[in-house]
Amino acid sequence: MAHQSIEVNLPLAKVYECLNSPVDFPRFMRRIDKVNKINSQTYEFVTQIGDDEYKWMTNIIDDLRNTRFAWITINGNLNQTGTIRFTPLNNGSRTRIDFSLDYRTFFGEPTEELNEFITNTEEQLGKDLDFFREAVENGTFKEQSEEKAEEKEQTAV
């Protein structure tokens, strides 16, 4: 399981607001292409690894406002579990994020690309959290997501 921590120069409530919905994960997690909300507790994740598309459904198993957010895979061709913990710092003016993420295959040996994807989770999670911190502290978190969506639309045309 990959684990990374980062401190953000924003109040806890603002940081939690940006991280408590998996639909927003592609805004900073470079290896997640898309997340679709199925209902209030269920989300479909989609990513491309090598030549293969991976899809999996997750359920939110813990959502304690401004404290903790967690999910598990319920079906799909890739198993993902994650937990995000939020800790206020400096009388609430800053926030520490503790992010744990794990990927596993449901069956058989992974392809070379999938094995690399799983093996590099910790390093990539650190890069993703650095990107998140920069975007959220600069107030560009939502803007970068819109630009990314526009780029995907243009390349699809």
Label the model's feature ranges.
Residues M1-T42, Q154-V157:
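Hydrophobic ligand-binding cavity/cleft-lining segments
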Residues V15-L19, F25, Y43, I60, ...:
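Hydrophobic pocket/interface hotspot
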Residues I38, I61-D63, R85-N91:
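Short beta-strand micro-motifs enriched in acidic
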Residues Q48-M57, T105-E109:
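Short, cysteine-centered beta-strand-loop-beta hairpins and adjacent loop/turn segments enriched
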